[in-house]
């Protein structure tokens, strides 16, 4: 019975720490710009579109790593001896069954 009482404060501490960490991650993500009203001036629209373009560039920026390989580079890595790897729809030769 005592082990149940001791684990409760530890569990509460872990949950609070997790909430603080998640709060920090939310603050790191850029906020979407607020759209101006229907009767906005051209200057306000220009500022909005500039900030929207900046926001979209941040959110959709290219990440380097696994997805950076092009198909040509991947085929060179997979088939270093051949220029064009042959495409076979089924294996040639005698069937095993």
Curated annotation (Swiss-Prot):
Positions carrying Phosphoserine: 41
Location, primary (coarse class): secreted
GO biological process: feeding behavior; neuropeptide signaling pathway
Pfam families tied to this protein: Hormone_3 (PF00159)
GO cellular component: extracellular space
Top-level lineage group: Eukaryota
InterPro entries named among the record's database cross-references: Pancreatic_hormone-like, Pancreatic_hormone-like_CS
Propeptide residues according to the Swiss-Prot or TrEMBL record: 68-97
Gene Ontology molecular-function annotations: neuropeptide hormone activity; neuropeptide Y receptor binding
Modification Phenylalanine amide occurs at: 64
Keyword terms: Amidation, Cleavage on pair of basic residues, Hormone, Phosphoprotein, Secreted, Signal
Family assignment from sequence similarity: Belongs to the NPY family.
Function as written in the Swiss-Prot or TrEMBL entry: This gut peptide inhibits exocrine pancreatic secretion, has a vasoconstrictory action and inhibitis jejunal and colonic mobility.
Protein known as: Peptide YY
Organism: Bos taurus
Lineage of the organism: Eukaryota, Metazoa, Chordata, Craniata, Vertebrata
């Amino acid at each position: 019975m005592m082990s149940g009482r001791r684990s409760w404060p530890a569990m509460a501490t872990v949950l609070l720490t997790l909430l603080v960490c998640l709060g920090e991650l939310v603050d790191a993500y850029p906020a979407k710009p607020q759209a101006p009203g229907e009767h906005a001036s051209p200057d306000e629209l220009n500022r909005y579109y500039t900030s929207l373009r900046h926001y979209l560039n941040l959110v959709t920026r290219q990440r380097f790593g696994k997805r950076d390989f092009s198909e040509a580079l991947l085929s060179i890595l997979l088939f270093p001896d051949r220029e064009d790897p042959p495409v076979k729809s089924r294996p040639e030769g005698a069937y095993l069954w």
